[in-house]
Amino acid sequence: MASNSALLMKTIFLVLIFVSFAISPATSTAPEECGSESANPCVNKAKALPLKVIAIFVILIASMIGVGAPLFSRNVSFLQPDGNIFTIIKCFASGIILGTGFMHVLPDSFEMLSSICLEENPWHKFPFSGFLAMLSGLITLAIDSMATSLYTSKNAVGIMPHGHGHGHGPANDVTLPIKEDDSSNAQLLRYRVIAMVLELGIIVHSVVIGLSLGATSDTCTIKGLIAALCFHQMFEGMGLGGCILQAEYTNMKKFVMAFFFAVTTPFGIALGIALSTVYQDNSPKALITVGLLNACSAGLLIYMALVDLLAAEFMGPKLQGSIKMQFKCLIAALLGCGGMSIIAKWA
């Protein structure tokens, strides 16, 4: 079921890509610099190339550290998944994901889809970024809800013979063990849906920012951008790694999910380098494609951070039973959001 949900989200993103390329900018009245080489004196492809190659390996290592740290936390006594420290770290990582959606991905989408390089009609007459982010959040909600309910219904059918078909009786003393087990399985499924959908949104965003870095040749800003992206990927990986850990996948699946997260930004950088002769980040088609993808990623990340991560944690029995823990986790979430807000100055 979780794999079907991820497949649906991938299909939606692919449809958006095809739609963006189907929209023709042929009659554009954009300035001449749109889709052409920049006149910025800082642009130097020969000097930028070694920096971008270094960025591939540095960001790869930072991503591996970020996503791998939570996965190895079971081997550290004070970082057990049921402990207070791990809960605080999860809230910090959730704040990072929320900050990524609000401070990085969504503003980029607004900037791209309102660029002067795009036609006045329709791009400047309708807030496509906000609309698609909202739609993406609702679609994520639908997938999250339907995947859980379908699993619950399927599991309920499987235990009907033991319940003798009496779904309206108050025989809690007989069905309680089954219900607890069913609830545990449903929660595990939710963790798995969360991990897969969150990984999808992060991967799309990571490829996009990697592509942008690989295509740029601005030596005045590239060093700061690389440093910011290292912190960005490491902290974002912590959030994803925590979700993968809770999903209780097999070691092989954990490795595969961590691997794909770690390599997506370096892959995007390599792709940007390879396409740097033909890809122009200010061309209409590039702006539309990346802008639409960023809007969808933003809606997904914001929903996942607020609903499936922060709200689920704060409304759970652990935090509801301790005002002190609520305060600590709130501070951690604010620090995560604040950190990503600071990084937004450079990336």
From Swiss-Prot:
It is found in: Cell membrane; Early endosome; Golgi apparatus, trans-Golgi network; Vacuole. Changing D144A: Abolishes iron and manganese transport. Reduces cadmium transport. Changing E236A: Suppresses transport. Monoubiquitinated on several Lys residues. Monoubiquitination controls trafficking from the plasma membrane and targeting to the vacuole. Residues 74-84, 147-192, 246-254, 308-326 are cytoplasmic. Residues 1-22 form the signal peptide. The chain crosses the membrane at residues 53-73, 85-105, 126-146, 193-213, 225-245, 255-275, 287-307, 327-347. Residues 23-52, 106-125, 214-224, 276-286 are extracellular. Changing K179R: Suppresses ubiquitination and loss of activity. One of its GO terms (biological process) is metal ion transport. One of its GO terms (molecular function) is copper ion transmembrane transporter activity. GO terms for cellular component: early endosome; endosome; plasma membrane; trans-Golgi network; vacuole. Induction: In roots by iron starvation. Keywords: Cell membrane, Endosome, Golgi apparatus, Ion transport, Iron, Iron transport, Isopeptide bond, Membrane, Signal, Transmembrane, Transmembrane helix, Transport, Ubl conjugation, Vacuole. There is a cross-link at K154, K179 (Glycyl lysine isopeptide (Lys-Gly) (interchain with G-Cter in ubiquitin)). Inhibited by cadmium and Fe(2+) ions and at 100-fold excess inhibited by cobalt, manganese and zinc ions. Interacts with FREE1. High-affinity iron transporter that plays a key role in the uptake of iron from the rhizosphere across the plasma membrane in the root epidermal layer. Acts as the principal regulator of iron homeostasis in planta. Also mediates the heavy metals uptake under iron-deficiency by its ability to transport cobalt, cadmium, manganese and/or zinc ions. Belongs to the ZIP transporter (TC 2.A.5) family. This is Fe(2+) transport protein 1. It comes from Arabidopsis thaliana. The lineage of its organism: Eukaryota, Viridiplantae, Streptophyta, Embryophyta, Tracheophyta. The gene is IRT1.
